[in-house]
């Protein structure tokens, strides 16, 4: 029986151990997509205790706590920080098979030096030890980033953001990690959402464009895109809950947009036409600036109306959708490619049934003398666990070139989540090692080591250059 989480954790063969310890563990972290708050990085936020650092914004943990029967008071309610931590610790031994068990213990081990497993029995001791480390070692936001050897962070930002904290970070010569905004025009895309008209008003104000038509909207967004670009933005992000392509005319889209500004009801077909038209327009702008477009496909959000009204979005009430995506996604990419305006693009699917869809879709639009121009993104959200990552790696390697893969992202709101890069790297090395051990690939350490370091760092560092 193997010891829990020893130095060879998840490394099941000798080749995997060599690849991880000699290659994967040696390169820095390039975290090009996350949801960290730029203000907390710029102000070097100091955490008051482990609960603030660990549980305040982690909907993965919140979902598990609800499933264990823990009252909402101890999850997002007003219970004390220690009581919230204690309830989480009480649940921990029962998370067998869940990646939260692995992530949590990696975080305790790497950032706090805690070797014990977390449980009701060890809760008090671990609470005191971690809080002492936070205080004595000054575990601020920047310190955690430095400890994890992170060299690049891509935050997720709204077009109306002033990016003041990104600017502040650029002026900090003592902080070596490059923190850059990502352009996420989510609120401009969701024409059926409550508050859409008010948001367009805010966009008009910050862009100094009177927005009365769809062309005005595109102009305003392009002004903000240029502002982001001037402040280091290389990456954009779109959430596509449903991918539905309809043919449309410019006149039709303008009419739909004006209807929304007038407060009229927009039906689902009109909303789909509008979002696709805007995505295609923005995609062309991204291509002109050599920016990367990320498409996150297939989330079914805010399923629980009662809890959405009580707590809000991004609180652990989202799940996997099962809509068809292949045809419509193909048409969107092709519309951009027809004019040679398809930007570098990363496609993520939340439903693993779509792994092979994306694994083959990316091959349709490669080219432009760019290795891996169109990427099948890493296992996302409900798939960023061992089985989900392995399925993504297998689909990509069998249907494309995993050697050109830009690797892992945290996609997280937590400063402790950088251990997910270690988790990914161990799984990657084990996957490649198994191919060698089973005789499916020769043991050529130099090329294998190069592939591993490329996937873990070098491919992304190259891909996200202007």
Swiss-Prot record:
Pathway of action: Carbohydrate metabolism; pentose and glucuronate interconversion
InterPro entries, per the entry: Metal_Hydrolase, Uronate_isomerase
A molecular function (GO) term: glucuronate isomerase activity
This enzyme's EC code(s): 5.3.1.12
Pfam families to which the protein is assigned, alphabetical: UxaC
Keywords: Isomerase
BP GO annotations: D-galacturonate catabolic process; D-glucuronate catabolic process
Catalytic activity: D-glucuronate = D-fructuronate; aldehydo-D-galacturonate = keto-D-tagaturonate
PANTHER family the UniProt entry points to: URONATE ISOMERASE
Family: Belongs to the metallo-dependent hydrolases superfamily. Uronate isomerase family.
Protein known as: Uronate isomerase
Provenance organism: Clostridium perfringens (strain 13 / Type A)
Record lineage: Bacteria, Bacillati, Bacillota, Clostridia, Eubacteriales
């Amino acid at each position: 029986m193997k010891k829990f989480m020893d130095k060879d954790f998840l490394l099941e063969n000798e080749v995997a151990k060599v690849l991880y310890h000699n290659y994967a563990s040696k390169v820095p972290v390039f975290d090009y997509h996350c949801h960290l708050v730029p203000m907390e990085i710029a102000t070097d936020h100091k955490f008051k205790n482990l609960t603030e650092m660990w549980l305040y914004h982690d909907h993965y943990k919140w979902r598990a706590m609800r499933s264990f029967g823990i009252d909402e008071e101890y999850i997002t309610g007003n219970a004390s920080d220690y009581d919230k931590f204690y309830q989480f610790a009480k649940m921990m031994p029962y998370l067998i098979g869940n990646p939260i068990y692995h992530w949590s213990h990696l975080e305790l081990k790497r950032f706090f030096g805690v070797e014990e497993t977390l449980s009701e029995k060890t809760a008090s001791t671990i609470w005191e030890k971690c809080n002492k480390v936070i205080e004595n070692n000054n575990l601020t936001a920047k310190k955690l980033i430095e400890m994890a050897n992170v060299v690049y962070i891509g935050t997720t930002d709204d077009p109306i953001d002033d990016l003041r904290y990104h600017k502040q970070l650029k002026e900090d010569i003592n902080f070596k990690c490059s923190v850059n905004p990502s352009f996420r025009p989510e609120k401009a895309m969701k024409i059926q959402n409550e508050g859409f008209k008010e948001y367009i008003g805010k966009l008009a104000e910050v862009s100094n464009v009177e927005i009365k038509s769809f062309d005005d909207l595109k102009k305003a967004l392009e002004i903000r895109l240029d502002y982001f670009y001037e402040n280091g933005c290389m990456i954009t992000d779109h959430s596509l809950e449903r991918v539905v392509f309809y043919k449309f005319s410019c006149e039709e889209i303008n009419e739909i947009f004006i209807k929304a500004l007038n407060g009229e009801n927009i039906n689902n077909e009109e909303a789909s036409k509008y979002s696709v038209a805007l995505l295609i327009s923005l995609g062309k702008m991204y291509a002109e600036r050599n920016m990367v477009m990320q498409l996150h496909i297939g989330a079914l959000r805010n399923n629980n109306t009662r809890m959405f009204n009580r707590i809000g979005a991004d609180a652990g009430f989202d799940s996997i959708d099962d809509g068809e995506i292949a045809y419509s996604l193909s048409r969107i990419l092709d519309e951009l490619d027809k004019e040679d305006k398809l930007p570098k693009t990363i496609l993520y699917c939340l439903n693993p049934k779509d792994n092979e869809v994306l694994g083959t879709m990316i091959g349709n639009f490669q080219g432009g003398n760019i290795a891996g121009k169109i990427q099948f993104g890493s296992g996302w959200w409900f798939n960023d666990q061992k089985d989900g990552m392995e399925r993504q790696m297998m689909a990509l390697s069998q249907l494309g070139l995993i050697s050109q893969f830009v690797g892992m992202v945290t996609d997280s709101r937590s400063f402790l989540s950088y251990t997910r890069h270690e988790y990914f790297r161990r799984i990657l090395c084990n996957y490649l090692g198994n191919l060698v051990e089973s005789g499916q690939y020769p043991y050529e350490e130099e090329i294998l080591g190069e592939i591993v370091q490329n996937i873990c760092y070098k491919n992304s560092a190259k891909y996200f250059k202007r």
